[in-house]
Curated annotation (Swiss-Prot):
One of its GO terms (cellular component) is mitochondrial matrix. The lineage of its organism: Eukaryota, Amoebozoa, Evosea, Eumycetozoa, Dictyostelia. It comes from Dictyostelium discoideum. This is Glutaredoxin-like protein. Belongs to the glutaredoxin family. Residues 27-123 form the Glutaredoxin domain. PANTHER family: GLUTAREDOXIN 2, GLUTAREDOXIN-1-RELATED. Keywords: Electron transport, Redox-active center, Transport. Coiled coil: none annotated. InterPro entries: Thioredoxin-like_sf (IPR036249).
Amino acid sequence: MSTNRRILTKKTENISNFINNYHSDVINEVEESITNNRVVVVGMAYNPHVSKVNKVLGEQGVQFKYLEYGSYFSMWSQRLSIKMFTGFPTYPQVFVDGTLIGGCDDTIKELNEGTLFNDLKKK
């Protein structure tokens, strides 16, 4: 059974083009970072969940690339473009080896379970 919501799986060509071209410079920067770095955190200033995941990854010795797009009152349209592109509604957005694993809680869960990050930690 698919976990995608049915309404989100059907888009017209115009909608798909809009999503793909809305702040394409930002999307290209995120995609390039995901391609060139094993772990990427996409976030925003002053967000406690973003701060927490950055702190926890650092404490665990996981090297990561951090991309910050504004704060609560700036760059909202750029953050919206990332949300539309990934389909994930909140920040941070954490990518490991090119795969979106989720946000802060998901990342901490993966760290605690040791499923994704063991080989990424500094010895």
